Amino acid sequence: MLYGSKQAAALWFNLLNSFLLKLGFQASPMDACFYRRACVVDGIPNAARSDAIIILHVDDMRVAAPPEILQVIHDQLFAEFQITTSDTGRFLGMDVDYDINAGVLKMHMTTYIDSTVQRFTSFDLSRGITYRELVGSLLWIVLCVLGTELLRVKDLAKRCNSYTIEDYNDALKVLDRIVSLKHYGIIFRRGGANKEFIPSKTRLGGGLENTDEYIYSIGDQGHANELEENNLYKLTEIDDATLDIVKVLADTNTRFTKVAYSDASFAVGETKQSITGFIVMINGVPILWGSLKQTIVVDSTCSAEYVAASVCCKQIMQTENMVQFLDFTCPQPYRMYTDSQACLKIATNASKLGMVRHLEIRYHLVRCIVLSGNVTLEYCITEDMLADLFTKIVTSAQDKRLTIRFYNDCVMD
């Protein structure tokens, strides 16, 4: 059914969606493939608690629920569709390791990276140049886990329509770099006890060496990022890791430390369009990251940073809406860091708006959100700007420092 016509995928989604709605699930307004079902207490649905969460990816499904509820959902799906079950250790190339005693869940792509190396380092002329396949594999890696290499892979993707053997060799160099990082990953800790780096607002001691000192803030509770697992392998049975996630979802007192970084690289390339970089983190764990070319040409670094901050605010609100859909309690605002004093003053002081009045209405979103209290805009020095990884190729020392901070010192054993 899935591979018959252009409409097959849409027909399949409509069929499965209508079935899940009949089971009492509610689809997220932000992501049509993300479902939750309210917990029923004494015959009355309690919207503040979830008894099951489902995430879809085409014909793959990941279900999080207590064992007895999971079995009921399994039987209902089995009666309607032909389904198979698999373990939760891998899904769509991502490995998930969980230590129930330590309360630590790690996501990495070591296995997928090894298979990618095996596929593309042995060049086969009979297959032709597989540049697009290689770039596609690299994109999947940097979008799922190894976000620090996004800018390099993005540059490779620009050459897909007109590539040469030199471009293929460049892609292999990026693959080599990713191999050196394959033991890094994203880590979630029970209770939200991830270390969160607090960037410096001024240079300490007048030198960069002191900016390597870590200042950490420990969050109270929360695992918002398990919900980022929107990649699945078939209908998976409940395990201790998933059950722990459900327990966290049921805690209405869950709180988070919420941080974002916004940066811009001014007037890049022949088009002179600036590059926006952003990263959104909860409890010190990266949730969203991206590198985008701005659609307009601005006349100053200040304007470029202001536009980037607005883009970052959109990502913050997307994350916040998803958290609210799951009925988490997280009243504190996001702290968004920028390394532009001018951008900071414009977004918080109406008397400085003259510098950006020429920008379209949508780019003033950052000011509206800051004034609403949902985001507090703060300054940090450039050396501590994590979003620098998504706007430009930084120095070797800074790249190493920011990479460690991005992955929160998470190295796979």
What are these regions (language model features)?
Residues T88-F197, E209-G222, E228, I381, ...:
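C-terminal reverse transcriptase regions that engage the nucleic-acid substrate
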Residues M1-Q76, S126-L151, D263-G277, T301-N321:
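Conserved pre-motif C helix in the palm subdomain of viral-like polymerases
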Residues N14, A38-N46, H108-S122, S274-G290:
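Reverse-transcriptase-like RNA-dependent polymerase core
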Residues S5, V58-D60, P67, M94, ...:
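Residues immediately flanking
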Residues D75-S86:
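A common structural junction motif
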Residues L23-G43, D176-L249:
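Charged, flexible boundary elements
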Residues R159-S162, F256-T257, T295-D413:
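RNase H-like nuclease module associated with reverse transcription
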Residues L204-G219, Y233-C302:
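RNase H-like nuclease fold core
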